[in-house]
Amino acid sequence: MRTYDDTFSGQRIYPGKGKLYVRGDSKIFRFQNGKSESLFLQRKNPRRIAWTVLYRRQHKKGISEEVAKKRSRRTVKAQRAIVGASLEVIKERRSMRPEARSAARLAAIKESKAKKQETQAAKKAEKAKNAANPKARVTSKQGAKGAPVKVAAKSR
């Protein structure tokens, strides 16, 4: 047996009962009785009429079975290794004292600064070596092809 739901009240409509209302835009509405049809045509909001299914759902009426609230699962933080550091290394760093950590940090900074200075010194030495023996002047491609050399103006 096929049943339909009332579009206004949400109640069940059994075969041979109710009315079918077709709007101008071809949307079909099914009403269980004249009461729900009348309220629909008056453009009443079913969420504000106490006996409709929509109102009862919105105001949590008649749901006595769900007394116990649903418990949500608590999220638990899990430590995972990341690229470049295993879990043991991470745990070791976490357990270090702040003083030891700052000392290790300063040592690492000092080491990186020394390395940087070293590379800069090497660059400077390379530059000085290149400046000591200059290469021949760079000639333009046009000149090499035999283009006439532009003579500087002497009248001024």
Curated annotation (Swiss-Prot):
<dbReference type="GO" id="GO:0002181">
    <property type="term" value="P:cytoplasmic translation"/>
</dbReference>
<feature type="compositionally biased region" description="Basic and acidic residues">
    <location>
        <begin position="110"/>
        <end position="129"/>
    </location>
</feature>
<protein>
    <recommendedName>
        <fullName>Large ribosomal subunit protein eL24</fullName>
    </recommendedName>
</protein>
<keyword id="KW-0689">Ribosomal protein</keyword>
<dbReference type="InterPro" id="IPR056366">
    <property type="entry name" value="Ribosomal_eL24"/>
</dbReference>
<keyword id="KW-0963">Cytoplasm</keyword>
<keyword id="KW-0687">Ribonucleoprotein</keyword>
<feature type="compositionally biased region" description="Low complexity">
    <location>
        <begin position="130"/>
        <end position="156"/>
    </location>
</feature>
<dbReference type="GO" id="GO:0003729">
    <property type="term" value="F:mRNA binding"/>
</dbReference>
<dbReference type="GO" id="GO:0022625">
    <property type="term" value="C:cytosolic large ribosomal subunit"/>
</dbReference>
<dbReference type="InterPro" id="IPR038630">
    <property type="entry name" value="L24e/L24_sf"/>
</dbReference>
<comment type="similarity">
    <text>Belongs to the eukaryotic ribosomal protein eL24 family.</text>
</comment>
<dbReference type="InterPro" id="IPR000988">
    <property type="entry name" value="Ribosomal_eL24-rel_N"/>
</dbReference>
<dbReference type="InterPro" id="IPR023442">
    <property type="entry name" value="Ribosomal_eL24_CS"/>
</dbReference>
<comment type="subunit">
    <text>Component of the large ribosomal subunit (LSU). Mature N.crassa ribosomes consist of a small (40S) and a large (60S) subunit. The 40S small subunit contains 1 molecule of ribosomal RNA (18S rRNA) and at least 32 different proteins. The large 60S subunit contains 3 rRNA molecules (26S, 5.8S and 5S rRNA) and at least 42 different proteins.</text>
</comment>
<dbReference type="Pfam" id="PF01246">
    <property type="entry name" value="Ribosomal_L24e"/>
</dbReference>
<dbReference type="GO" id="GO:0003735">
    <property type="term" value="F:structural constituent of ribosome"/>
</dbReference>
<comment type="function">
    <text>Component of the ribosome, a large ribonucleoprotein complex responsible for the synthesis of proteins in the cell. The small ribosomal subunit (SSU) binds messenger RNAs (mRNAs) and translates the encoded message by selecting cognate aminoacyl-transfer RNA (tRNA) molecules. The large subunit (LSU) contains the ribosomal catalytic site termed the peptidyl transferase center (PTC), which catalyzes the formation of peptide bonds, thereby polymerizing the amino acids delivered by tRNAs into a polypeptide chain.</text>
</comment>
<feature type="region of interest" description="Disordered">
    <location>
        <begin position="110"/>
        <end position="156"/>
    </location>
</feature>
